[in-house]
Every structure is written in C-alpha cells, then in structure tokens.
C-alpha cells in the first residue's frame, strides 16, 4: 500500500515538471505504440500508472487522451486520468470534447484540479 501511495505522489509531483509546455503532440506512430502497451495491461490500476507516466513525458491531443480513456472500465479511474493528464493536452481548445462523458459534478472536479 505504501508503494502505491508513493507512486501516486511521484506521478503527481511529476505533473508540474513535464508536459506543461506542449509545443506539439506525439506522432501517430508513437501514440499507437504507447496505446498497444497499455492495452496489454490486465487491470485499470496498471493502465492508469502507464497512462500517467506517458502523459507526464509526452504531449497528447484530446483524441489521443480519449483513446487512452476508452481502455479503462472504472469510471472513477477515467476521471483521475483526465485530472492527471490534462496538463499534457496539446489542444486544450477541445476540452469540451474531452468532458462529454462526464457528469457536471465530475466536470467541475476535473476543472478545479487542473487550474
């Protein structure tokens, strides 16, 4: 349990260090490779860790983030991924598209956490 908490803290700290100054999103080939890696993971927690690590290092588009989210079953984990990855989104003008599958309450939670 302590190691999981430690990983979450490390990833949270890394958000402020990486991905906040996106100049361009990753290429389609690179993204497809990352997506396949995530697809092979067995559970949402493992997928969350990988997606968080990738988005801390790479700039992604809203559509790419949505592709990652589609691999997750648990809705709360989807919210967490958006919160964790939002700073790495290149095309923030498409945020509305990203928020379409969330309730108003979840949208407000996400937006509060990324400001």
Map each language-model feature to its residues.
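Sec-dependent N-terminal signal peptides
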Residues: 4-15
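General marker for long, soluble alpha-helical cores
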Residues: 18-115
């Amino acid at each position: 349990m302590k190691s999981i908490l430690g990983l979450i803290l490390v990833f949270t700290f890394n958000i402020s260090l990486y991905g906040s100054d996106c100049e361009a999103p990753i290429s389609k080939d690179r993204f497809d490779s990352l997506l396949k890696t995530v697809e092979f993971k067995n559970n949402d927690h493992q997928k969350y860790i990988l997606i968080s690590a990738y988005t801390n290092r790479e700039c992604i588009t809203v559509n790419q983030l949505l592709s990652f989210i589609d691999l997750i079953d648990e809705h709360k984990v989807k919210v967490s991924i958006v919160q964790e990855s939002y700073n790495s989104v290149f095309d923030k003008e498409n945020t509305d598209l990203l928020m379409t599958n969330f309730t108003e309450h979840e949208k407000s939670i996400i937006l509060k956490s990324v400001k």
